[in-house]
A protein has these predicted regions:
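TRNA-recognition modules of translation machinery and tRNA-sensing kinases, especially anticodon-binding
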Residues: 1-421
């Protein structure tokens, strides 16, 4: 139906927007303290960007992208994630030109064709950061801490942080061979997707939700046994930095990310009560992505957090902010002359920083008082024929059930001072 939003999308109505803006305020405040600048990229990109960046053969590229041809027969895709877009912007706009570390953050909609359920929508929102140009393990730790601080700044508790290293091009082939040797015996019992992954990307077998409970999965080789000395040292230093910062974590040698570009550090923060959708943030290092997209070799690390899941976690812990009242002041005008006199007062109040509302339909006193109550306004200003003749207005304190008369000449000044107390 034309009056229904497409499946997997959702309207965010005024009574819910306050929670979103609260989360976004925390994000912007935190990123300012960490020194990250906001970037806004297009919602669609050339399809090849994601094919090369995320990787052919990944579930995202093969099954989940919204891809279409425009009128110029160019293949375009609604962004399924934003790291590839951020790297493209980094290259196109020569953000690397000063040779320094670039620290970026974003908030925006992403799109994946998936089975809609709580915490998993076809249009969903992410907050993420990308730090490009530095390979220090301290930067990995900073990014992990930023993700963790974001969630705890919202008041969330009961979070788990899992950590792993997925190696580098020097040591990952060894692990790939060990995985293929191990899973060869179980190949007939793997799901169809994992049978395909066995040849193309056996690491992603470890990320399979369907085969996760198979008893043989627990015996799969751990990548930590295959890391080269450089990756081992890097991973140990990341852990040392996190320990020094007082953040608890759990090593998970089978934690891999579902995108091909990750190298070395991989992490995931979960809120277990959300069940199957418990992962609220995750990321890692992607030292080869900039080069893969046409740039010079550039180390980089980042993460993304799913805001729908974050809001679900906040709701479960009763941490959603209270909806503020719609108005501070409600003007009640009785009669046409009073309505004409009230309108410029309404504008003056708003210009003075007061949230002010007024009924334009000429309803009765009783009906307008009901509107004032529904708006949550602390004060109702009543202007009728008698008040207009005396050049005054009645100011009713809705909380104290008290009222006083105020001269119109001083009304705006009085209300501004009362509201700002």
């Amino acid at each position: 139906m034309l009056t229904n939003a497409p499946r997997g999308t959702k309207d965010i109505l005024p009574d819910a927007v306050g929670a979103w803006t609260h989360v976004e305020h925390v994000i912007r405040d935190l990123c300012a303290r960490y020194g990250y600048g906001e970037i806004r990229t297009p919602m669609f990109e050339h399809t090849e960007l994601f094919q090369r960046g995320i990787g052919d053969g990944t579930d995202v590229v093969d099954k989940e992208m919204y891809t279409f041809s425009d009128r110029g027969d160019r293949s375009l895709t609604l962004r399924p994630e934003n790291t590839a877009s951020a790297v493209r912007a980094y290259l196109q706009n020569k953000l690397y030109a000063d040779g320094g570390l670039q620290k970026l953050f974003y908030i925006g909609s992403m799109f994946r064709y998936d089975r809609p359920q709580a915490g998993r929508m076809r249009e969903f929102h992410q907050f993420g950061v990308e730090a490009l140009g530095e390979e220090s393990p301290a930067l990995d730790a900073e990014v992990i801490l930023l993700a963790y601080d974001f969630l705890t700044a919202l008041g969330l508790t009961g979070l788990t942080l899992k950590l792993n290293s997925v190696g580098c091009p020097a040591c990952r082939p060894v692990y790939r061979e060990r995985l293929q040797a191990y899973f060869k015996e179980y190949l007939p019992t793997l799901c169809d997707d994992c049978k395909d992954r066995y040849t193309r990307s056996p690491l992603r077998i470890l990320d399979c939700k369907r085969d996760a409970e198979q008893p043989f999965m627990a015996g799969a080789p751990a990548i930590t046994d295959c890391l080269c000395p450089a990756c081992t040292e890097h991973f140990e230093q990341v852990q040392q930095h996190l320990t020094a910062a007082g953040v608890s974590y759990e090593l998970d040698p089978r934690l891999v990310r579902g995108l091909d570009y990750y190298t070395r550090t991989a992490f995931e923060i979960a809120y277990p009560p959300l069940g199957a959708q418990s992962a609220v943030a995750g990321g890692g290092r992607y030292d080869g992505l900039v080069e893969e997209l046409g740039g010079n070799p550039t180390p980089a690390v980042g993460f993304a957090a799913g805001l729908e899941r974050v809001l679900l976690a906040l709701e479960q812990q009763n941490l959603l902010p209270a909806q503020p009242p719609a108005a501070d002041v409600f003007l009640i005008a009785l009669g046409d002359a009073a309505a004409k006199a009230a309108f410029p007062l309404l504008h003056e109040l708003r210009c003075g920083g007061v949230r002010a509302l007024m009924d334009y339909a000429g309803r009765s006193m009783k009906a307008q008082m009901k509107q004032a109550n529904r708006s949550g306004a602390r004060y109702a200003i009543i202007l009728g024929e008698d008040e207009l003749a005396a050049h005054t207005a009645l100011v009713r304190d809705m909380a104290e059930s008290a009222q006083e008369t105020c001269a119109l000449d001083y009304l705006v000044e009085k209300m501004i001072s009362e509201v700002k107390v």
